Amino acid sequence: MQAARVDYIAPWWVVWLHSVPHVGLRLQPVNSTFSPGDESYQESLLFLGLVAAVCLGLNLIFLVAYLVCACHCRRDDAVQTKQHHSCCITWTAVVAGLICCAAVGVGFYGNSETNDGAYQLMYSLDDANHTFSGIDALVSGTTQKMKVDLEQHLARLSEIFAARGDYLQTLKFIQQMAGSVVVQLSGLPVWREVTMELTKLSDQTGYVEYYRWLSYLLLFILDLVICLIACLGLAKRSKCLLASMLCCGALSLLLSWASLAADGSAAVATSDFCVAPDTFILNVTEGQISTEVTRYYLYCSQSGSSPFQQTLTTFQRALTTMQIQVAGLLQFAVPLFSTAEEDLLAIQLLLNSSESSLHQLTAMVDCRGLHKDYLDALAGICYDGLQGLLYLGLFSFLAALAFSTMICAGPRAWKHFTTRNRDYDDIDDDDPFNPQAWRMAAHSPPRGQLHSFCSYSSGLGSQTSLQPPAQTISNAPVSEYMNQAMLFGRNPRYENVPLIGRASPPPTYSPSMRATYLSVADEHLRHYGNQFPA
């Protein structure tokens, strides 16, 4: 069984975290031995949380300084173009989003590991509680049989064997053996208080773990939602989404540093326990259970003897002696006193049941079962649980870094959106290729019919009247296209023949549109040339 004890070895991260300096609030060194009830030890853990709070303050100071510089300092456009500015914002957002997604992935893994470790601890505590409760039940049940049930049968047999002194001596001897068994069983430790403490610890662990797991899950969802808002804000160039991202990012930044403080303090405290768990358990159970019994279960050494060996051996010998005496009475006394058979058979059945309880008790008080539960609990705390806390701490740090980057990129994106809107405002509204003019024309009614080619054949006889009147510059190109469409097809619709009235192609004139435009123009020239010859 010595090999089972070697199975637990404090991992390297436990030693590394335990080596973190423990300093009190007065900046004095504190003993790193795990003692949660000690006020100085509690101050050392609180000091670690204050270190994270100081880091949060420095982070906020840096962000405020950067935001002030970004809002009041003007950048030279000759040195860095707008296109480069937009590209820089995009890549900053991409990097921040990737860091945030990586942080959430690490956080999910750490949250799952911590949850597994906590539930493994709870299962081990429940198994140990089941063993302790079984020991107490067997001891109390056997004591009840020896003190009450056996006494009743012996009292009736004493009345039956009143005329035989030798049989009365045998009954008295059986009664002495039963008293010896009761005395030996009373020497076994009572685990009732230990069971209550372990049950309370298991319930508290489950309660805290449930809300811890749920809180981190909500924090992961919040971080992903903030990343989504940031992507939508940059894609739609929405200042409202950008402002929401900045506010939520600041909140998540505070939560990230707070979770880092909690994870760091919890990880250091757990490592202090995992370095020497036996010492802490011996100190806690010193007033409830003997040190010999505690060491027997903690170390379970094959070379050491069980503290219950003498008690169990005496119990077994007493049962064997009583069974021999009862068998002798059944053989010699029943032929003379037939009324004693029922009580003797009942005593024999009671002794057989007590022997079965003895075997169960021997198996339960053996150190191997409880020592396995102890090792499983240590594995849940010091391996899965502590690893999960480290991953959660890494998540908190990466999330703080990602949201700090997002907050830094926010003012630059805001200024870029403002500059882009200002550039749109500087464009001439009469420009037919202005995107704003196209949007305004699509939502406004037509401004009136323009002169079409039909108005040029109005019946004036002079040759000069055949020339089309000068086309006025219109700031509603959509209406002009619709009027020309009504001329040729009677239905107002958009055509692929732009700017017919102006007789000039747009700058982005495709070959197909050019061919269509030239064919229509030639047809119109031939038509009007035949009707109005020079």
UniProtKB/Swiss-Prot annotation:
Q: Which GO terms describe its biological process?
A: L-glutamate transmembrane transport
Under catalytic activity, the entry for this protein gives: chloride(in) = chloride(out); L-glutamate(out) = L-glutamate(in)
A GO molecular function for this record? intracellularly calcium-gated chloride channel activity
Single GO cellular component annotation? plasma membrane
Q: Tell me where the sequence motif RGD sits in this chain.
A: 164-166
Q: What is the effect of changing residue 31 to Q?
A: Loss of glycosylation. No effect on cell membrane localization, increased ubiquitination and significant decrease in protein levels
Q: Which residues lie on this side of the membrane: Cytoplasmic?
A: 66-87, 235-240, 410-534
**Cellular localisation:** Cell membrane
Q: How is it modified after translation?
A: N- Glycosylated. Contains high-mannose, hybrid and complex oligosaccharides. Ubiquitinated by NEDD4L, leading to its proteasomal degradation.
Transmembrane feature ranges: 45-65, 88-108, 214-234, 241-261, 389-409
Where does the chain bind Ca(2+)? 113, 116
Pfam families recorded for this chain? Tweety (PF04906)
The record's annotation in InterPro entries points to: Tweety (IPR006990)
Task: Please describe the organ and tissue distribution of this protein's expression.
Answer: Expressed at higher level in brain and testis and at lower levels in heart, ovary, spleen and peripheral blood leukocytes. Up-regulated in 13 of 16 renal cell carcinoma samples examined. Up-regulated in colon carcinoma.
Name the job this protein performs. Answer: Calcium-independent, swelling-dependent volume-regulated anion channel (VRAC-swell) which plays a pivotal role in the process of regulatory volume decrease (RVD) in the brain through the efflux of anions like chloride and organic osmolytes like glutamate. Probable large-conductance Ca(2+)-activated chloride channel.
**Record's family?**
Belongs to the tweety family.
The protein depicted here goes by the name Protein tweety homolog 2
Species this chain originates from: Homo sapiens (Human)
Which gene is the coding source of this polypeptide chain? TTYH2
